[in-house]
C-alpha cells in the first residue's frame, strides 16, 4: 500500500520537493515529477532521433537537445583529428577549452590536498571521502559506481536490473519507467492513511479523510444560539440544519412499504441500496444544479422555504456594529432650490392659458 501523510487543506494546492535542503515549490504535480527526476538521476526522456537515442532527466533538457538537431552546425573544431561540430560559437569555445586547451581545473578545497578534477561530480565524491561521509557504492561486479546519495544509487541500480514492481507478490521487471507505470495500472489501487492506517480505494476519499488529521481543521459551528454542534464540512452542517432545526425531510423513499424520509438527496440514494442489494456502485454527483433552460411541459420543483429564519442565527454574528440612522436625507437628492419660498396658490387658473370660447349668439326676439 502507498502511505500518504496528512497535509493541511488549502485553497490553492502546492507541491513541495521532499528532498532534504531543497525548497522548490510547484503548482502542478507534473512539474514536481520533472524536478524530482533531477534529484534521483532518472533519465526518463529519450531522444527520438534514429542515430541519437540520448536520455535526459528533465523535460527542458531534452527540449534544448532537440533544438540541436533542428539547427545547422556551422562551427567545426579546427583541431586536427577532431570532427566535432557545434551550432554556436560559445559551444565551440567551451569544447576547445576543455578538450584541447588549458581549462581551469576544479581543485580540492581541503588543506593539504592537491587533487584536481574536471567534473563537479568527481569533485563532490572526492570531498565526501575527506569528510568521512558514507558513500553509496554499486555492488554489481565490475561496476564500482559511487555516490553520496542513496536515491542516486537506487536510480543507478535500475540501469542494471530494470524497474521492478513495488508490489510484494509481483515479480515483474520492466525495461523502462514508462513500461513500469503501464504495468502498475493493472494492480488495484490501494491507498492508506499514514496517520491512522485506514485504507481507501479512491484518492479523492483519502484527501477528504486527511482533512480530519490537519493541525487546524475546518470548524463550522451551528448558527443557532442554543446549539453547540460543530461540523467539519458544509454538507454535515446543512444536513444538521435541515433535519434537526428546520425538520425539512422532503426526500421520501419511493417504495410503498418504506416510510423513511431524508433531509439530503445523497442520503436517500444511499438508502436505496437497502431495497436493491445488487446495486453496488453509486455515482453520486454532489452539488449538481438544475438546468437553467427546461424543456416544454417541465416544471422546476418548488423549493421549501421557511419565511422566518431569525431564530437560527445569533444577532451578534449578524450585526458587528450599530446602525446609524440618517435624519436629514436632503443631501442625497439633487433638487432645484427655490430662490423665494413658495406660497400656496388658491386660484391656479392663471397658470394655464386656456383658449377662450366664442360668445354665444343671442336669439332674436
Curated annotation (Swiss-Prot):
Superkingdom of this protein's organism: Eukaryota
Coiled-coil blocks: none
Ranges annotated as C2H2-type zinc finger: 15-39, 45-69, 75-100, 106-130, 136-160, 163-187, 191-213, 220-245, 251-275
Keyword hit for Metal-binding: yes
A single MF term (Gene Ontology): zinc ion binding
A Pfam family annotated for this UniProt entry: zf-C2H2
SMART domains associated with the record: ZnF_C2H2
Entry keyword RNA-binding: yes
Keywords for the protein's UniProt record, in alphabetical order: Metal-binding, Repeat, RNA-binding, Zinc, Zinc-finger
SUPFAM superfamilies to which the protein is assigned, alphabetical: beta-beta-alpha zinc fingers
Described function: p43 is a 5S RNA binding protein which is a major constituent of oocytes and comprises part of a 42S ribonucleoprotein storage particle.
Record protein name field: P43 5S RNA-binding protein
Amino acid at each position: 500500500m502507498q502511505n500518504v501523510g496528512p497535509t493541511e487543506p488549502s485553497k490553492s494546492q502546492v507541491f513541495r520537493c521532499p528532498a532534504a535542503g531543497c525548497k522548490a515549490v510547484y503548482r502542478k504535480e507534473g512539474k514536481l515529477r520533472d524536478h524530482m527526476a533531477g534529484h534521483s538521476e532518472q533519465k526518463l526522456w529519450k531522444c527520438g532521433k534514429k542515430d541519437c537515442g540520448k536520455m535526459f532527466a528533465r523535460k527542458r533538457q531534452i527540449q534544448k537537445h532537440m533544438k540541436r538537431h533542428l539547427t545547422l552546425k556551422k562551427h567545426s573544431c579546427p583541431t586536427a583529428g577532431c570532427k566535432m561540430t557545434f551550432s554556436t560559437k560559445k559551444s565551440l569555445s567551451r569544447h576547445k577549452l576543455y578538450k584541447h586547451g588549458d581549462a581551469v581545473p576544479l581543485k580540492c578545497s581541503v588543506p593539504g590536498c592537491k587533487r584536481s578534477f574536471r567534473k563537479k561530480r568527481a569533485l563532490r565524491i572526492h570531498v565526501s571521502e575527506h569528510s568521512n561521509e558514507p558513500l553509496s557504492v554499486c555492488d554489481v561486479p565490475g561496476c564500482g559506481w559511487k555516490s553520496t546519495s542513496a536515491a542516486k544509487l537506487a536510480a543507478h541500480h535500475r540501469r542494471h536490473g530494470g524497474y521492478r514492481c513495488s508490489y510484494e507478490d509481483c515479480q515483474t521487471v520492466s525495461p523502462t519507467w514508462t513500461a513500469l507505470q503501464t504495468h502498475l495500472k493493472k494492480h488495484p489501487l490501494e491507498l492508506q492513511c499514514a496517520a491512522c492506517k485506514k485504507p481507501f480505494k479512491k484518492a479523492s476519499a483519502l484527501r477528504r479523510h486527511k482533512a480530519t488529521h490537519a493541525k487546524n481543521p475546518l470548524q463550522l459551528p451551528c448558527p443557532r444560539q442554543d446549539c453547540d454542534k460543530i461540523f467539519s464540512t458544509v454538507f454535515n452542517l446543512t444536513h444538521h440544519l435541515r433535519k434537526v432545526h428546520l425538520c425539512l425531510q422532503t426526500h421520501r423513499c419511493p417504495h410503498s412499504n418504506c416510510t423513511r424520509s431524508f433531509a439530503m438527496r445523497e442520503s436517500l440514494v444511499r438508502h436505496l441500496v437497502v431495497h436493491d442489494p445488487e446495486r453496488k456502485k453509486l455515482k453520486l454527483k454532489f452539488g449538481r444544479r438544475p438546468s437553467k433552460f427546461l424543456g416544454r411541459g417541465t416544471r422546476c420543483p418548488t423549493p421549501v422555504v421557511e419565511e422566518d429564519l431569525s431564530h437560527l442565527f445569533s444577532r451578534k454574528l449578524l450585526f458587528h456594529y450599530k446602525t446609524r440612522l440618517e435624519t436629514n436625507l436632503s443631501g442625497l437628492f439633487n433638487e432645484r432650490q427655490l430662490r423665494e419660498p413658495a406660497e400656496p396658490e388658491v386660484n391656479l387658473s392663471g397658470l394655464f392659458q386656456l383658449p377662450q370660447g366664442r360668445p354665444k349668439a343671442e336669439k332674436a326676439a
